[in-house]
């Protein structure tokens, strides 16, 4: 089967990591899978980058205005304190359906595509009539723009009065949800959710009422993320084997929903236990952290072992193996990669029972699930596992067994394969085509051998009419005004630089004139018969502008004392030329 997979970024974040795993496992099952993305991974052979095709200047200006208004400014300037997770209306994107690139494929799998594909662009891909599977890494495919709703259930209604926006004069989230319900309601468009929780939310939204929602858990490399000897793993990262360790990590620890503040409270509650306090005082406990750390962690009064961003699976597996407990204090989450990875490495997790986490963690069996964001209860659970090695080891074994049973790569790939076949996709055996097939005509090749396709940005008709069209035109006018302001500022800056250069040159001229022999020789004359120019260097005040300095130079050059010394200056120059000619042997 020929499958095109779409994702904004092939390298960073949990969604791209899960996407790459699925691509690898589908490829191992014999399918030809290409990744189409904005930010390619140079390590991936079948990775096509999308670059913007330049239109005429007026069209480009309007496209840029649409991006700034709908994809950037409107939301950014109105965000409330409810959440700092990305909010992407997904209204402007690249038009790939007409590029010729997609003709050779049998099916399409669309992952995290904010700032890449728009709602309307996805609908155009679906209009090609081939199976389209939208893999849900968060809630964005079925909300008015939020990637996580922060507890709001507006997606089940109409997304009006969005709590993540302070004000919403265009009622944009409501319009986005309406467009999704209209454009994604096709029998060949199916959503795949990794967890029952996310699948239930997607079904509740009504966005996929035609193609439906299927639950297929994500997967993990069970041959890479494996249990290791904890003493050896601790030694490998520079720790004493006897130290108790708890691990916290996320790609972006500053994201509010990841619960970093909860972790700080958990650590504080743990200090109430005399045994933990004794370990802390003696250096017998360490907090391990990876990802983008925050200053608050250092303020916890625990010894911190910051592992930074880890982009190597072997090093990451070592970090998990070095931990006695993995702490997952998220407020909102789907099926965190870090949870699966920790469990695969035999490290029991302690997490809040949010989102899809209870699908994987069975409380008291392969980890602990804490309800209600009770940080004191989470602290007690972490403490118990740190101080009861036998119980932690039993949970570790159960965690590994759960991963081996439900989350291997091939199991996820087989389920996707069955879904695509059920949606009417052609099997690999029935499509013997040359690699990339008729899509070759749409491809360009870089000097480094990489492949890319050029596609224009597309602004849907829905945004060019009515109140949205009015707002877009106002944004275009504002962009024009801002561009003119930038041009004028550049002109002023250049003028100021020229003025500074002229002023410096005049300073040098004045310095030379006022220290010349002609000027010094007539000092007595000036004191008696010629008064200095008021406000000049010759008087008491320093000139403040190039115009004043120029006037001063001209006054000096036309002064009586300067003119009286003209014959002497001419005689001096003649003598100087004569002396040079004598030295050069030009005069015998």
Residue ranges: model-predicted function:
Residues 363-364, 368-375, 384-389:
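Conserved acidic donor-binding segment of nucleotide-sugar-dependent glycosyltransferases
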Residues 280-286, 290-317:
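Nucleotide-activated donor-binding/catalytic signature segment of Leloir-type glycosyltransferases, i.e.
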Residues 331:
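Aromatic "clamp/platform" in nucleotide-sugar-dependent glycosyltransferases that forms part
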Residues 377, 384, 391-406, 412-418, ...:
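A short, well-ordered alpha-helix in the C-terminal region of glycosyltransferases
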Residues 430-588:
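Boundary detector for helix-to-coil junctions that initiate low-complexity/charged tails
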Residues 318-323:
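Short alpha-helical donor nucleotide-sugar binding micro-motif in glycosyltransferases
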Residues 348-351:
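Short hydrophobic beta-strand element within catalytic cores of glycosyltransferases
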Residues 239-258, 264-268:
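Conserved donor-binding/catalytic core segment of Leloir-type glycosyltransferases
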